[in-house]
């Protein structure tokens, strides 16, 4: 007699509970932001809808010491990507992937630091900055983002690189390591756990669910972009400068010109939709089918990260089947490569010079 088949109801029930959580929390987050909007309008209606004109980029975005602005059009999607490159062509490639709400400029300290021994490329991800931004939400699925990096590597004439990712760029870096391990000499991730750790942890820990509330808020069409833009992009400025979330407590490592660079880029017409569309596809792409990373890996973590609980960093090791080092920096914020650049650069140098091998 054949063994009884497991009831089909259980997977269906799990899926129902999962999507009920996603959309239920999405509705809650939307309600909170709607109340914030109404409060702002009630207090200062004119200020709420005011936006300063920003026709010209700040001078720091054209600083020649950071490198050369370049563009590459990849074959598969036909999209054109913008990047800033420093260091001589022909040197080993170091590819830098930024997070949200960032762009290539988040790597300014690393562009200067590593150009002596590497061809350092700081990319604007799909939909960000001067890179092309497809209109359709489906164009931002994780499979597309992974394919972008593979095709960019080919277009730059490299088969391997040192890959460094922060925040959402860290998510993509982990996935590249899972899908295309042969492309990565060494993997460095800053303040983002292995994606499988993240998806499992967030469902079991309400505190992390709260910290990641923007993932759910971003599922709503158009409203998140609007909320980021009111009060002359106050929410964007707050992320980088507030006591709780800022770069080095109240943004002490961020100059006025640095902050204006971020506001300039994201204040351009339609500049927020592409970045937020990255998040609008995440729940349909996870959990992963494959998990293990076989590349030597360094995970750097700011202990004062307002968005990610440090316990996720410690659990990540189980998904790396190779050399793995975790370094947690006390008083480091979520924006670690900008917050403590000298320390971060030193740790990266040490890891790059270590003799590690692929198991």
From Swiss-Prot:
Q: Which UniProt keywords apply?
A: Hydrolase, Membrane, Signal-anchor, Transmembrane, Transmembrane helix
Specify whether Transmembrane is a keyword of the entry: yes
- Which branch of life, at top level? Eukaryota
Q: Which GO terms describe its molecular function?
A: epoxide hydrolase activity
Q: Which residues form the AB hydrolase-1 domain?
A: 92-337
Q: Look up the EC number in the record and give it.
A: 3.3.-.-
State the name under which the record lists this protein: Epoxide hydrolase 4
What gene does the UniProt entry assign to this protein? Ephx4
């Amino acid at each position: 007699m054949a063994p009884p088949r497991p009831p089909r109801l259980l997977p269906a029930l799990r899926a129902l509970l999962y999507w009920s959580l996603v959309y239920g929390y999405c509705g809650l987050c939307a309600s909170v932001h709607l109340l914030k909007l109404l409060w702002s309008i009630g207090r200062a209606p004119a200020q709420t809808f005011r936006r300063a004109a920003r026709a010209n980029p700040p001078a720091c975005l054209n600083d020649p010491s950071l490198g050369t602005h370049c563009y590459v059009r990849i074959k598969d999607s036909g999209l054109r990507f913008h990047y800033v490159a420093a260091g001589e062509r022909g040197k080993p490639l170091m590819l830098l992937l930024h997070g949200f709400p960032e762009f290539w400029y988040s790597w300014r300290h690393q562009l200067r630091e590593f150009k002596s021994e590497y061809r350092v490329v700081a990319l604007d991800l799909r939909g960000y900055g001067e890179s092309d931004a497809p209109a359709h939400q489906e164009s931002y699925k994780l499979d597309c983002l992974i394919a972008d990096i593979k095709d960019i590597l080919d277009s730059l004439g490299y088969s391997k690189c040192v890959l460094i990712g922060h925040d959402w760029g860290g998510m993509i870096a982990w996935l590249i390591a899972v899908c295309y391990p042969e492309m990565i000499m060494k993997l460095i991730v800053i303040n983002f756990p292995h994606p499988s750790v993240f998806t499992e942890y967030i469902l079991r820990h309400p505190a992390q669910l709260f910290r990641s509330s923007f993932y759910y808020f971003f599922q709503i069409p158009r409203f998140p972009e609007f909320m980021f833009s009111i009060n002359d992009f106050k929410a964007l400025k707050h992320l980088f400068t507030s006591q709780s979330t800022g770069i080095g407590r109240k943004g002490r490592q961020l100059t006025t010109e640095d902050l204006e660079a971020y506001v300039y880029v994201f204040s351009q017409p339609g500049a927020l939709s592409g970045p937020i569309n990255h998040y609008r596809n995440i729940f349909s792409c996870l959990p992963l089918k494959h998990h293990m990373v076989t590349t030597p890996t360094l995970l750097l973590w700011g202990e004062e990260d307002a968005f990610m609980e440090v316990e996720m960093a410690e659990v990540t090791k189980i998904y790396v089947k190779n050399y793995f080092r975790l370094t947690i920096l006390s008083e480091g914020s979520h924006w670690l490569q900008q917050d403590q650049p000298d320390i971060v650069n030193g740790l990266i140098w040490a890891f790059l010079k270590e003799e590690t091998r692929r198991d």
